Amino acid sequence: MSDEEVAVFLEEQRVVICATNGPHGWPHLMPLWYVVRDGDVWAWTYAKSQKVRNLDRDRRGTLQLETGDEYQELRGVMIEADATIHRDHELIVEFGVELMRRYAAGATGPEVMDAVRTQAAKRVALQFVARRVASWDHRKLGGVY
């Protein structure tokens, strides 16, 4: 995929699989809701989660998004990234509101802000800065494999 196609694909998809390096050498994979901000993938999660502990120890992570059921429909993006863990409460609240706008369409108003503010106290924001991006789109193969 071109850079533009990758950007559109990231906007279309809803869940990213985040792989971090676990404490015993095994990959730790978890699904995350996300938002693309200035070309970086951002997510939030509980501050005490295993993925945060893993990223505290080793900031490298791999993100993968994919779609398609039949071989000729498969599309995806894999992003090798460095993660920054943001712990600033106001930044987390701001990001949480942005995340809710994406995933809870129509959720606005003071009750949403109160809910986000409450959740933000237990969360961190994760910013994934791409080092390398790989993508595939089997629809472009035209049935020739």
Model-inferred region functions:
Residues 71-145:
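Charged, gly/pro-rich active-site loop segments
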Residues 14-47, 55, 62-66:
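Short beta-strand segments
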